[in-house]
């Protein structure tokens, strides 16, 4: 960002060069400290007891992370249907609803990045969601997409933008900030050949809606994460990060391997370039999230490897 010309300075940089020097020069008040966070879903396997949770949280802290991002369906008991749906999506919640997350997070010395919720809950009972977020010490509430929603319809997507804008405006009155978290469905084209994520960006006000951009899902959908990060600019205040690749097998039969999330720096996502853009965008927190394919099937060991990669760069 250039204070002299009032425009962002992305452009192409020579090989081996970074956007970081320009970023540093732009900060009159000094270096921005980007916080590093872990999505609570990565700790679901450790939720069998408060003792196990605290042990995992302490390892998160030791790995260089500053905070935890919470999900409303994990911090209190969820219905049977929610547990079934999340498990089917590869996001099992374990016994997390029985744990004292507020007390355990405080004991670990970590803070809370944000609370993931859903638009319906906010529209029906905003005060309750706000109260829960404030209890955990965060002013950020994140909507993680819509279930059974027609993203191919321009009117439906525009309606969603209107609802998000109104909800964000109402949240601001309580000192809260609304975010939208993408997956891959937001790259769906409607009948006007518009992508849903573009519509949400263009038809909402920056004061009412910020974005938690998930570059893993953009890459999975075949899009260019760098271009989307540049397009979002400073409305991208949170960044969901994961690398994408595979684990090599000696007995691989075919020349086609199945991709999945892998530890940061071990896959094929252009993470160094994405990190440079995140710094230009003044991203506030980087949130690590993977659901499976962890090294030795151990999510905490996996986040420790990714934490080392982040610690060396952030």
PLM regions and their residue ranges:
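Conserved radical SAM core fold
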Residues: 74-77, 146-151, 246-248
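Histidine-acidic metal/acid-base catalytic patches
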Residues: 1-67, 72, 83, 134-137, ...
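Catalytic alpha-helical scaffold of carbohydrate-active enzymes acting on polysaccharides/glycoconjugates
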Residues: 57-60, 94-108
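The substrate-binding groove and active-site-proximal loops of carbohydrate-active enzymes
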Residues: 42, 87-91, 116-119, 147-154, ...
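Active-site acidic/histidine proton-transfer and metal-coordination neighborhood
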Residues: 111, 116-210, 300
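Glycine-rich, proline-tolerant flexible connector loops at the mouths of alpha/beta enzymes
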Residues: 69-100
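Surface-exposed charge patches
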Residues: 58, 103, 131, 169, ...
């Amino acid at each position: 960002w250039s204070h002299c010309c009032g425009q962002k300075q992305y452009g192409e940089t020579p090989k081996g060069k970074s956007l970081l020097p320009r970023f540093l020069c732009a900060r009159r008040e000094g270096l921005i400290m980007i916080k590093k966070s872990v999505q609570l879903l990565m700790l679901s396997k450790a939720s069998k007891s408060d003792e196990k949770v605290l042990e995992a949280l302490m390892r998160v802290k030791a790995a260089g992370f500053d905070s935890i991002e919470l999900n409303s369906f994990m911090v209190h008991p969820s219905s049977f249907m929610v547990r079934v749906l999340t498990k089917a999506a590869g996001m099992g919640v374990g016994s997390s609803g029985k744990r004292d997350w507020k007390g355990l997070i405080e004991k670990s010395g970590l803070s809370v990045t944000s609370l993931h919720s859903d638009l319906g809950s906010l529209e029906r009972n905003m005060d309750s969601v706000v109260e829960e977020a404030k209890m955990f010490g965060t002013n950020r509430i994140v909507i993680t997409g819509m279930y059974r929603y027609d993203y191919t319809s321009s009117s439906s997507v525009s309606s969603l933008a209107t609802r998000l804008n109104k909800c964000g405006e109402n949240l601001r009155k309580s000192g809260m900030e609304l975010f939208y978290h993408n997956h891959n469905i937001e790259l769906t084209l409607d009948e006007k050949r518009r992508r849903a994520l573009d519509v949400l960006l263009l038809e909402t006000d920056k004061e009412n809606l910020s974005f938690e951009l998930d570059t893993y899902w953009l890459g999975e959908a075949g899009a260019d994460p760098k271009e989307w990060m540049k397009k979002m600019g400073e409305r991208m205040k949170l960044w969901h990060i994961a690398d994408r690749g595979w684990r090599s097998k000696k007995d691989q039969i075919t020349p086609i391997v199945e991709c999945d999330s892998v530890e940061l720096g071990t896959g094929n996502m252009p993470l160094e370039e994405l990190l440079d853009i995140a710094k230009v965008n003044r991203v506030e927190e980087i949130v690590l999230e993977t659901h499976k394919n962890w090294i030795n099937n151990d999510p905490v060991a996996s986040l420790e490897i990714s934490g080392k990669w982040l610690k060396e760069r952030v």
